[in-house]
Amino acid sequence: MEIINTIAALRHRLDACRKAGKSIGFVPTMGYLHKGHLTLVEQAKAENAVTVASIFVNPLQFGKGEDLEKYPRDLERDSEMLEAAGVDFLFAPGVADMYPRPMETVVDLPGLGGELEGKARPGHFAGVATVVTKLFNIVQPDAAYFGEKDYQQVAIIRRMVDDLAMPVRVVPVATVREADGLACSSRNVYLTEEQRAAATIVPKALDEAERLYKAGMRDTAEMEAALAAFIAREPQAKPDVVAVRHPDTLATLPHLDQPFLVLLYVQIGTTKLLDNRVITIKSKKEAAE
C-alpha cells in the first residue's frame, strides 16, 4: 500500500491507473477505523481493480462545540489495518493540503441536509457534501462506498451526485454491528463501560419499531412518540431525533402503509449515536406464512 499526502501525487498515480484501464473504488473515511470501514474496503476491492481509501478529519462538518479536536486519530493503526485489507492507495492529507485557504465554495443541499440530523447539527451536511465533492474531484473514482449507518448522509451524497451529474456510482453498504447489536462507529470509543451498556437501547428501539408495526401500529406520529418514550426509559439516553420517513426520499409519511425508515440520533452521555432500519411491509400472504 502506498501512502500519499498531496493531491498532485495522488492524481499522478491514479492517472496512470486509469490509462491502464483499471477501475477505481474509493472509500472515504475520517479514520479510527472499525470493521464497518473494512467491509466497505472489502466490497470496493471485490468490484474494482484499484482501491483507494482516504483518511481526513474534515473540519467543515464539525459545528461549534462538537468533537473536532478530540475526534480519535491513529494513522499508524489505521494504515496497518488498510494495508492488511489490501488497499492500494491511502490518501491522508492534512488540512492545509485540502484547504490551503478558506473555502469560498460550499456544496449545500438545504432540503435534505437541513432536517433530522442536519437540524440538530446546522451546517454539518454542507461540510460533508463539500468535502466529498472535493474528494471525488481528486480521486475521480468509478464507485464510492458508504455505510448505511449514516443513512441521511448516503441519501444526500446520492442526490448530489445525481444533481451535478458526477460520473460516480454511489454504493451503500449494510451497517455492521457489534455482538450486542450496537452499530459500529468510531465514536463508540468515547463511551464508558456503563454508557456502552446503555447504548444498546438504540438498536433495541429499532426492534421495538418492528414489534409495534407487527402489532398493528400504523400512525407515524404515534410510532415516533412510542419510540421516543421507549428510548427515554434508559436514563442515560436522550433522543435528539426519532423520525419515521420514506426510505428513498426521506419525506414524511402520515401512515405506515409502505416500507418505511426509522432514523434515530441518540445522545448517550456526551456521545451522539446514529442508527436506522428500513422496515418492509409484508403482504397478508407473506405475513401468514
From Swiss-Prot:
Residue positions binding ATP: 30-37, 147-150, 176, 184-187
Keyword terms, alphabetized: ATP-binding, Cytoplasm, Ligase, Nucleotide-binding, Pantothenate biosynthesis
Record has Plastid as a keyword: no
Catalytic activity: (R)-pantoate + beta-alanine + ATP = (R)-pantothenate + AMP + diphosphate + H(+)
Entry binding sites for beta-alanine: 61
GO cellular component: cytosol
Positions of (R)-pantoate binding: 61, 153
Misc. comment: The reaction proceeds by a bi uni uni bi ping pong mechanism.
Function: Catalyzes the condensation of pantoate with beta-alanine in an ATP-dependent reaction via a pantoyl-adenylate intermediate.
Name used for this protein in its record: Pantothenate synthetase
Species for this entry: Allorhizobium ampelinum (strain ATCC BAA-846 / DSM 112012 / S4) (Agrobacterium vitis (strain S4))
